[in-house]
Each structure stands twice: as structure tokens, then as C-alpha cells.
Amino acid sequence: MIIGIDIGNTHIVTGIYDNNGELISTFRIATNDKMTEDEYFSYFNNITKYNEISIKKVDAILISSVVPNIIITFQFFARKYFKVEATIVDLEKKLPFTFAKGINYTGFGADRIIDITEAMQKYPDKNLVIFDFGTATTYDVLKKGVYIGGGILPGIDMSINALYGNTAKLPRVKFTTPSSVLGTDTMKQIQAAIFFGYAGQIKHIIKKINEELNEEIFVLATGGLGKILSAEIDEIDEYDANLSLKGLYTLYKLNK
């Protein structure tokens, strides 16, 4: 058994893989940099017991993190409870892609590394555009296995919270698919504008990428809220909720 831990700014998503690399369970908890290795093990142990998954023999623990100060907690978790050294995703690993000349990859996120790794595993011969709808939304573009650029914009929840946090009376709303672009009350108007406005941003970004590349592209999406948006954006060819966790295992196998 292998454990994959994808640490984001908002959530920590854990995947449990069988010996063939198939995901057999996933669970999500809020990111908390005050949590100890013992507290995390308590979460982990309870959830695996509930799902009747034995964790007596763990061969490897894989960690991707965009929150550097939490990594050490999970290294302690791996050593204390499973007697293994965690494998940490970074640019020192063997990667299935290269960076184009002129790309400054300093600070390139582990989340983007594993997303690209899995996308390349699935579609090695395609020009790829990968959207990850997380705390921030990122997009990465690869041409024949070469990373040529991308972008970062505020995430959907970040946009909602900014509107709520910087106004006196506007409510915090849930991100959902509205029935109309014309909201009939304040809450529905925010939901409509956020949904269709964000979808419009993504459509336009894809349009501009198409214009710059002038070649056929394949667009993948992942991230918690990506599923809702992908249904609205015809330009997205595929949504994979577990792209990151799959990429974490694929990168591990590539470097084994």
C-alpha cells in the first residue's frame, strides 16, 4: 500500500493506492499548519478503519505541498507511524516534461508538477492545457512535452470571499450553477455573476492560447470546483477530479 498526500492552501487531500497504483480511497481535511503528526494520524486511522482499509503495511508515503512549513509534520508522520521516509515532490525529481528556454521555474508549485505529470502520462502526444481550480486557479501549457508558460488567477472561493469581506452588506454565497445570468435577488445576482464571469474568463484564456499556439490543443481540468465549471465550458475536453493524486503516484513510479 502507498499513501499520497496532496497539501493545498485550503485542503489536504489524501489518497490510498493499492500495489498496482489504483486509488482505493480518498479523503479531504482542512489545511491547518498547527496540526501535529499525531492529530493527522488520528484522522487517517479513523477514516481508514471506517472504510475497512488495513494500514499495517505501507511501502511509501508521497507528499506534494504548496505549504512548505507543513511538510515536516508529514515527514514525522511517515517516520513515526510507518517507519518510512516520505518522498517529497520537487523539481529535483525526474520529470516527464522540460521547460522551454526563457521560463523562470523558480517557485514552480508541486501541485502543478503532479498535474502536468499525469496529463503527460495520459496524453503524451498532445499539446496540453491544464487548469487546476484550487485556492488559486492555475493553467499550464505544454507543447510536445515542453512547458511554454501558464498563468495564475484568484480562485473561485477567493473571489467570493473578497466580495463578502470587502463590503458591508453583501452575503457570502455558495458557488453553484445558476438557472439564469439574470439574478432576481442579491444572492442570486452574485452567484450568476461569479459563475458566468469566471466561466467567461476561462473561455477567453483558452481562446487566447489557441490563437498564440495556432495548433490543436487538449484541455484538462481538475480541482474541487472544476467539475461545476467544466459542465459550462465546452472548450474543456476532460475533467479529472483525481488528476493530482494520480500524478503523485505516476511521478513516484517514474523516480523509483
From Swiss-Prot:
One of the GO BP terms on file: coenzyme A biosynthetic process
Annotated protein name in UniProt: Type III pantothenate kinase
Needed co-factor(s): NH4(+); K(+)
Similarity comment: Belongs to the type III pantothenate kinase family.
Catalytic activity: (R)-pantothenate + ATP = (R)-4'-phosphopantothenate + ADP + H(+)
Pathways involved: Cofactor biosynthesis; coenzyme A biosynthesis; CoA from (R)-pantothenate: step 1/5
GO MF annotation list: ATP binding; metal ion binding; pantothenate kinase activity
Gene name in the database record: coaX
Alphabetical keyword list: ATP-binding, Coenzyme A biosynthesis, Cytoplasm, Kinase, Metal-binding, Nucleotide-binding, Potassium, Transferase
Binding site for ATP: D6, I7, G8, N9, T10, H11, I12, V13, T135
Cellular compartments annotated: Cytoplasm
Pfam families from the UniProt entry: Pan_kinase
The enzyme's E.C. designation: 2.7.1.33
SUPFAM superfamilies per UniProt: Actin-like ATPase domain
Binding site residues for substrate: G109, A110, D111, R112, T186
Chain positions recorded as K(+) binding sites: D132
Assembly with partners or alone: Homodimer.
Metal-binding is among the record's keywords: yes
